[in-house]
Structures are given as C-alpha cells and as structure tokens.
C-alpha cells in the first residue's frame, strides 16, 4: 500500500513539474504580465512597424479617398460624427498593453442615408485596388473563411502592422458606419529619445529605445 502511495505521489509530482514548465504567467489570468520574453517579442513587433506619423498620413490619404468615392457614387450620403472615442496619448490595446508605443483611433462616423447596394458595389469596386496597393486585405470574415464577396455590406480592412479600417454599409433602416485605427506604433521621436516623462512607465522612467529587457536593453522594471 505504501509503495502504491509513493508511486502515486511521484506521478503527481511529475505531472506538476511538467505542467509548471508549460504554464505561462498569464495562463489563468489573461491580464497578467506574460513575462519579459513575451513582452520583448511584442515590443520587437512594434519596433519593426512604420512610424506612427507615417501611418497617420497614410490613413489621412485613405480617408480622403474613401469619402471621395462615397461622394462620387452616393452623393445623397452625408457624414456625421456618431461616437466620439477617447484618443490614446500613450499605450496600446491588447495584446500590446504593456508595450512602449502609441495607438490612435478616429471618431466613429455615420453616413446617412446609406448607399444603395448598387452604389455600394461601385464604391468598393473602386476602393479595392486602393486598399490592395496600401497593403490591406479584407477583414470581414471569421478566421479560416474566405472574405465576403465584393459588394457585401462589410468591407472592413486590416493590414499586417495592425492598422484597421471599419467600413460597413447600412440599409434603409440604418446608416453606413466608418472608422479607422492606427494599431500600435512608435512615434518617430521615440526611436532617438525616450518618450516624454509623463508617457513612460511610472515604475521605469529611464526606458529608452529599443525598450527591451534583453540585449540591447531599454527596460529594467517589470511592467505593471
């Protein structure tokens, strides 16, 4: 009996040790700090993206094009601001909440009355090559499924650097909805000098580019 008990205890300890090696810091709490190695991986992703100012200019140009196409094919549609969003001055959305970077979102715009299905098809047909040239792909289906056909109400877009454009047509009961988001990027100045003091982690005021825990460094304190 004692031998069986010892064998069971040893087996349980073995399983516990195996699990300990596999469990990540945020396995049970998705909001927990995932560890320095994972944070460095995420920071390197952001460091490799275009500067925030570059993305802002690209989105400003695309915004003008989107509005021009809607005005061309659906002149009855008028835009208004429906929802004012809070603009992040520092920090990014999940999974980059502990990453050094900035993320900005537009207001949520509504177009009334919405383009007709025929007008909408003309609009997205002209926008398709524009989005493709800017590096976007459709973001209107669940992962693993093909994009919805051209002319479907949802013509939202996403790019590999995290930039998103939400563009969804309405109908005779609801307006067109439109907004965009830069995703997490570094301002150009943060590559040559630290962020302003009030935008640095409170417990790590001496951060500097490339903002890594590992070599070549830039962070020394665990992120909250």
Curated annotation (Swiss-Prot):
> Which is an annotated Pfam family here?
LppA
Give start-end of the signal peptide. Answer: 1-21
- Identify where the record puts lipid attachment of type N-palmitoyl cysteine: 22
Q: Lipoprotein: present as a keyword of the record?
A: yes
The entry's cellular-component GO terms read: plasma membrane
**Where does the protein end up?**
Cell membrane
UniProt similarity note: To M.tuberculosis LprP.
**What name does UniProt use for this protein?**
Uncharacterized lipoprotein LprP
Species = Mycobacterium bovis (strain ATCC BAA-935 / AF2122/97)
